[in-house]
């Protein structure tokens, strides 16, 4: 598996697990969970996580941006204007061009507003950003995002923070079949087996936050997700057997007593 890298915007990563930095009890807990997960990319909610006020604890004090790739995101934005302003600010603060876009449409279920998302992706791409896009699991919309310049497609498994796991495997398979962009499951995972399933569907990676941060034992869950992603990826590359409604004996038919 040494040469099996996750490639995003021409940069190679050993881990296919991306971890969010929100919802932990402390930055110290967050940093330890990320270390155990093996993740090399972390999402950072620009509007919620302190990355600029030196009078308060900085995320950089706990997670070294020279070792871990920061992926600024627009969590909490409900229209294109908010999202664009947030990511422009992120570029001002840290020079970040690789970003994660999410434009929410509803405060209750946190589904993405795809009209605003599509519009934002097009604008950000023109401005030189490399945009990884949180979206619904609609294959047509995923293709449109690719056409306007997205560098990665990040469909939800289920509503953010729900822990329901992948609800529509068929659509994920269709999206996989029609794009060569990195496909990363984002939102709604609840346990390590969900990550393994995502990888077995052919996804290039998964993003987990609530599933780890709010687990009864976050550190143990971080390690579980690490192993789940690895197992799922290895299973996908190995190639599963064909399904059959009939049995198939595993013992040889010749040389029977």
Curated annotation (Swiss-Prot):
<dbReference type="InterPro" id="IPR013785">
    <property type="entry name" value="Aldolase_TIM"/>
</dbReference>
<feature type="binding site">
    <location>
        <begin position="187"/>
        <end position="188"/>
    </location>
    <ligand>
        <name>1-deoxy-D-xylulose 5-phosphate</name>
    </ligand>
</feature>
<feature type="active site" description="Schiff-base intermediate with DXP">
    <location>
        <position position="100"/>
    </location>
</feature>
<feature type="binding site">
    <location>
        <position position="161"/>
    </location>
    <ligand>
        <name>1-deoxy-D-xylulose 5-phosphate</name>
    </ligand>
</feature>
<dbReference type="GO" id="GO:0005737">
    <property type="term" value="C:cytoplasm"/>
</dbReference>
<feature type="binding site">
    <location>
        <begin position="209"/>
        <end position="210"/>
    </location>
    <ligand>
        <name>1-deoxy-D-xylulose 5-phosphate</name>
    </ligand>
</feature>
<comment type="similarity">
    <text>Belongs to the ThiG family.</text>
</comment>
<keyword id="KW-0704">Schiff base</keyword>
<comment type="subunit">
    <text>Homotetramer. Forms heterodimers with either ThiH or ThiS.</text>
</comment>
<dbReference type="Pfam" id="PF05690">
    <property type="entry name" value="ThiG"/>
</dbReference>
<keyword id="KW-0963">Cytoplasm</keyword>
<dbReference type="InterPro" id="IPR008867">
    <property type="entry name" value="ThiG"/>
</dbReference>
<dbReference type="InterPro" id="IPR033983">
    <property type="entry name" value="Thiazole_synthase_ThiG"/>
</dbReference>
<dbReference type="GO" id="GO:1990107">
    <property type="term" value="F:thiazole synthase activity"/>
</dbReference>
<keyword id="KW-0784">Thiamine biosynthesis</keyword>
<comment type="function">
    <text>Catalyzes the rearrangement of 1-deoxy-D-xylulose 5-phosphate (DXP) to produce the thiazole phosphate moiety of thiamine. Sulfur is provided by the thiocarboxylate moiety of the carrier protein ThiS. In vitro, sulfur can be provided by H(2)S.</text>
</comment>
<dbReference type="GO" id="GO:0009229">
    <property type="term" value="P:thiamine diphosphate biosynthetic process"/>
</dbReference>
<keyword id="KW-0808">Transferase</keyword>
<comment type="pathway">
    <text>Cofactor biosynthesis; thiamine diphosphate biosynthesis.</text>
</comment>
<protein>
    <recommendedName>
        <fullName>Thiazole synthase</fullName>
        <ecNumber>2.8.1.10</ecNumber>
    </recommendedName>
</protein>
């Amino acid at each position: 598996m040494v040469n099996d890298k996750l490639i995003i915007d021409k940069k190679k990563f050993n881990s296919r697990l991306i971890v969010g930095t929100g919802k932990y009890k402390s930055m110290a807990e967050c940093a330890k969970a990320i270390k155990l997960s093996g993740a090399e990319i972390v999402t950072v909610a620009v509007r919620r996580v302190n990355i600029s006020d030196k009078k308060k604890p900085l995320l950089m004090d706990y997670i070294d941006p020279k070792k871990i790739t920061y992926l600024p995101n627009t969590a909490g934005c409900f229209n294109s204007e908010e999202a664009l302003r947030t990511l422009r600010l992120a570029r001002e603060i840290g020079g970040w061009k690789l970003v994660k876009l999410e434009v929410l449409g509803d405060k209750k279920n946190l589904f993405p507003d795809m009209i605003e998302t599509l519009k934002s992706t097009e604008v950000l791409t023109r401005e030189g950003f490399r945009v990884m896009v949180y979206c619904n699991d609609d294959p047509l919309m995923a293709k449109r995002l690719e056409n306007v310049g997205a560098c990665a497609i990040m469909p939800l498994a289920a509503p953010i923070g729900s822990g329901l796991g992948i609800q529509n495997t068929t659509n994920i398979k269709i999206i996989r079949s029609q794009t060569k962009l990195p496909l990363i499951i984002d939102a709604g995972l609840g346990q390590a087996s969900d990550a393994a399933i995502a990888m077995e569907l052919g996804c290039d990676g998964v993003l987990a936050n609530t599933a780890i941060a709010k687990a009864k034992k976050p550190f143990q869950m971080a390690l579980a997700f690490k192993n789940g992603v690895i197992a799922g990826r290895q299973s996908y590359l190995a190639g599963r057997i064909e399904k059959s409604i009939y049995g198939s004996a595993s013992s040889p038919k010749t040389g029977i007593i």
